[in-house]
Amino acid sequence: MGCCGCGGCGGCGGRCGGCGGGCGGGCGGGCGGGCGGGCGGGCGGGCGGGCGGSCGSCTTCRCYRVGCCSSCCPCCRGCCGGCCSTPVICCCRRTCHSCGCGCGKGCCQQKCCCQKQCCC
């Protein structure tokens, strides 16, 4: 399960380390702001120009472009589960699997998708 790094994400890289259970909470806000612009254009360091499955790991391929589906990060399948309307950081925490209301089972930007208005 990934934490918050986007390759060139400034605020979170060092602290995330092994991407364990405590990563989602510890890096939430800073990573969202730091990665938004840089990752939105190309899904982070490992994805090149597309999102077609030639990505390295979920830690190097964490952001979706507009219209870019979750095939970009295999370990994010079932988390964001599809295309996002805006570039976001995919939250791949186990706690999100219990989210089954509103717009679906998944989460974006470190929050579980249990609302009518949702990015996924």
From Swiss-Prot:
The protein's role, per its UniProt record: In the hair cortex, hair keratin intermediate filaments are embedded in an interfilamentous matrix, consisting of hair keratin-associated proteins (KRTAP), which are essential for the formation of a rigid and resistant hair shaft through their extensive disulfide bond cross-linking with abundant cysteine residues of hair keratins. The matrix proteins include the high-sulfur and high-glycine-tyrosine keratins.
Family: Belongs to the KRTAP type 28 family.
Encoding gene per record: SCYGR2
Protein name in the entry: Small cysteine and glycine repeat-containing protein 2
UniProt KW keywords: Keratin, Repeat
GO cellular component, one term: intermediate filament
Domain of life: Eukaryota
19 X 2 AA repeats of CG: annotated segments: 4-104
Note from the entry: Human have a similar number of genes as other primates despite the relative hairlessness of humans.
